[in-house]
């Protein structure tokens, strides 16, 4: 028999009754019923119940052991009997009569329990992450991640893509996020950077003559944590394709996402094909560029209705209406509750009216609406008896942010929100440029390296604020999974694009010398995308925080509490690297912006 096990703890069934077996695992739980010990033994594969009778050698050993001790147990498979079957366990029809027990790894008192998923402080969990990962939910999440990545690889190869590796040590990037830098011992005073993404390398692979590239790429960015963003490092499905237009990129990625979320979605519906929603339309209808389409409500821009109005709360402001059917009969606390929610998002309040059976509008602002206002709103919003309408007014960005949140919350409270579904969409037609409201200067709105939709002609002839870019996002349930773009591979078009944003040609030539040199030696049209693996798994696992899908994440302050990183280097190490440390000083943001201050081309915004 094998030194440690003949079977796993998730393997034995009723057909194995009478078999002598050897199991190894962790003591998950124990119960003492009249001197008879019942032990749940757990390994990676499952749980098997052990029984140790009073007076046996096995009972003498097991009685002294604490939870999470690692043991090897020899015994015989016996039936539990019909009345004692545990239907929640695949091994629930049998148990092991323990005959011999060997302690393989003793466990000291635990900092928290493993066999329950009670609320333990996240910092504590991260400090003892190896214990946290023994918990069923966390173990399941990490195994889901493993299966998802394996499936992605298989599907990408089937779609004709080739997996290629790109460097981890590279040059510092002029793009928006901060780099993690690595000193070079062999080149004193010089530094490598860990890649924010393989962006330039994957484009160079296309220029090298390869056609369909992918990798599960580690990316490193020194940025703050969010619920859907882990500080330090993350992984993305990095993709690039040659001789493609926008729809050529959409086709394989949409197929991949549909198959992947169908495979791992536990029966949740996956909506396909994915709708294409222009950026401007998304901002007006949903209040943001990552709409949660499970909310079956849409905002309506009614700014023009109140132009010149005497109603000061709306006059001269951007005004958005949210019609909600079948809510007029809701009690006042329903309306007040949504108002409180809007205030939590930064609003001063939330105006509303409801439509009675006679079609008349009632509510706090009804008296301020003229007959013409009521007529236009009824027609434009499709109002009918039972409807309620919520209003937001303010600066465009402000009212968009607030009403996007109100839209989703109202849908949830009014029964207009779909459960158990993955609703994907593509956001397209991003503006190439935007105006800084304070300085009046034109700058890139998102990705400075994408191709303008009209090429050089649009750059030379159109108002910059009217130029659209071949940029796109893929969004699922309000989570942005990735940005992507058709790349600007023509040097003169790129220089012109940067010129419009106020960058001198020699600055661009200096900062992007390597890419421009490659573009001038025969570059094909190419484009790509990079969906975040962590966010994909977060959605599939239905977890609210991305750190729940990563085996060993940093905490919100970019610290590894388990390994004690970052650490202080000894003076000898610093000397070897020719590094002298200075005391930290408070710094102010530099007046001059870096070149291409926008986020990385395929970064989730």
What do these predicted ranges mean?
Residues 1-605:
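Class II aminoacyl-tRNA synthetase catalytic cores and aaRS-like
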């Amino acid at each position: 028999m094998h030194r440690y096990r003949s079977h796993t703890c998730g393997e034995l069934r009723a057909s194995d009754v009478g078999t002598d077996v050897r199991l190894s695992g962790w003591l998950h739980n124990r119960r003492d019923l009249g001197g008879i010990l019942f032990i749940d033994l757990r390994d990676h594969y499952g749980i098997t119940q052990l029984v140790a009778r009073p007076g046996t050698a096995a009972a003498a050993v097991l009685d002294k052991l604490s939870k999470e001790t690692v043991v090897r147990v020899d015994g015989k498979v016996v039936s539990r009997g019909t009345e004692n079957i545990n239907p929640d366990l695949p091994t629930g029809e049998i148990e092991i009569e323990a005959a011999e027990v060997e302690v393989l790894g003793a466990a000291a008192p635990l900092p928290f329990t493993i066999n329950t998923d009670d609320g333990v402080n996240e910092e504590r969990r991260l400090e003892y992450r190896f214990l946290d990962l023994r918990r069923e939910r966390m173990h399941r999440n990490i195994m889901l991640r493993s299966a998802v990545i394996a499936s992605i690889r298989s599907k990408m190869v089937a779609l004709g893509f080739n997996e290629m590796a790109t460097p981890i040590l590279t040059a510092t990037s002029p793009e928006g996020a901060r780099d993690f830098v690595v000193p070079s011992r062999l080149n004193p005073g010089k530094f490598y950077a860990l890649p924010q993404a393989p962006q330039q390398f994957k484009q160079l692979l296309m220029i090298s003559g390869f056609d369909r590239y992918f990798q599960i790429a580690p990316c490193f960015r020194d940025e703050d944590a969010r619920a859907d963003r882990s500080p330090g490092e993350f992984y993305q499905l990095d993709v690039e394709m040659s001789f493609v237009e926008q729809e050529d990129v959409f086709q394989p990625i949409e197929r991949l996402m549909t198959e992947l979320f169908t495979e791992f979605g536990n029966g949740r519906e996956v909506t396909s094909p994915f709708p294409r929603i222009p950026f401007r339309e998304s901002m007006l209808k949903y209040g943001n560029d990552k709409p949660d389409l499970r909310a079956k409500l849409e905002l309506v821009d009614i700014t023009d209705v109140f132009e010149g109005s005497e109603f000061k709360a709306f006059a001269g402001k951007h005004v958005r209406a949210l019609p909600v059917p079948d809510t007029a009969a809701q009690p006042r606390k329903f309306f007040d509750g949504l108002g409180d929610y809007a205030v939590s998002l930064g609003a001063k309040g939330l105006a509303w009216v409801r439509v009675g059976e006679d079609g008349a509008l009632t509510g706090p602002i009804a008296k301020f609406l003229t007959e013409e206002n009521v007529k236009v709103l009824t027609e434009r919003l499709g109002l009918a008896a039972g409807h309620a309408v919520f209003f937001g007014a303010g600066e465009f960005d402000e009212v968009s942010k607030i009403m996007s949140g109100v839209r989703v919350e109202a849908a949830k409270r009014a029964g207009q929100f779909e459960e158990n579904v993955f609703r994907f969409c593509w956001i397209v037609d991003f503006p190439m440029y935007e105006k800084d409201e304070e300085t009046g200067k034109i700058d890139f709105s998102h990705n400075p390296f994408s191709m303008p939709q009209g090429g050089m002609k649009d750059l030379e002839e159109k108002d910059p604020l009217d130029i659209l870019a071949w940029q796109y996002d893929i969004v699922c349930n309000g989570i942005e999974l990735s940005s992507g773009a058709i790349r600007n591979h023509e040097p003169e078009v790129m220089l012109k694009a940067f010129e419009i944003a106020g960058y001198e040609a020699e600055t661009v030539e200096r900062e992007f010398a390597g890419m421009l040199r490659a573009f001038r030696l025969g570059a094909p049209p190419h484009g790509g995308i990079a969906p975040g693996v962590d966010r994909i798994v977060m959605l599939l696992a239905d977890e609210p925080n991305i750190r729940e899908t990563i085996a060993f994440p940093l905490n919100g302050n970019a610290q590894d509490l388990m390994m004690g990183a970052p650490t202080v280097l000894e003076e000898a190490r610093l000397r070897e690297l020719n590094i002298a440390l200075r005391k930290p000083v408070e710094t102010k943001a530099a007046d001059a912006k870096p070149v291409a201050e926008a986020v990385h081309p395929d970064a989730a915004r």
